[in-house]
């Protein structure tokens, strides 16, 4: 505990918070261009082929981005919208592609959790009674 005189001479230092998605530069989303689409294997206890893209963001930074959902339409040179969000079992992947934005289609046939996968709402047909 500092004395009163110590606080007069040196003010308290505030804690520096470290961001988990530095390439976004405090923005919720950034747009970018897809350079490479590839599959990556996860860390030890898990086994799969996770879909990952390398994207050059509008601020000239290059990042690895996870493509969520089943089947995707991401190709090289596609424009993508990137949000923060780590993938726990993929080292170095700290960002997600936003499906249903720009050149990327949403997941087809999705009924639950549609907003996360860019799936449109099913149209209900009115019936006469």
Swiss-Prot record:
Signal peptide interval: none
Identify the InterPro entries for this entry. NA-bd_OB-fold, Ribosomal_uS12, Ribosomal_uS12_bac
Would you kindly state one Gene Ontology biological process term found in this protein's UniProt entry?
Answer: translation
Q: Which parts of this chain are annotated as the region Disordered?
A: 110-129
An example GO CC term for this entry is: small ribosomal subunit
GO terms for MF: rRNA binding; structural constituent of ribosome; tRNA binding
Per the record, residues carrying 3-methylthioaspartic acid are 89
Q: Which UniProt keywords apply?
A: Methylation, Ribonucleoprotein, Ribosomal protein, RNA-binding, rRNA-binding, tRNA-binding
Family (UniProt): Belongs to the universal ribosomal protein uS12 family.
Subunit-structure text: Part of the 30S ribosomal subunit. Contacts proteins S8 and S17. May interact with IF1 in the 30S initiation complex.
Q: What does this protein do?
A: With S4 and S5 plays an important role in translational accuracy. Interacts with and stabilizes bases of the 16S rRNA that are involved in tRNA selection in the A site and with the mRNA backbone. Located at the interface of the 30S and 50S subunits, it traverses the body of the 30S subunit contacting proteins on the other side and probably holding the rRNA structure together. The combined cluster of proteins S8, S12 and S17 appears to hold together the shoulder and platform of the 30S subunit.
According to UniProt, the name of this protein is: Small ribosomal subunit protein uS12
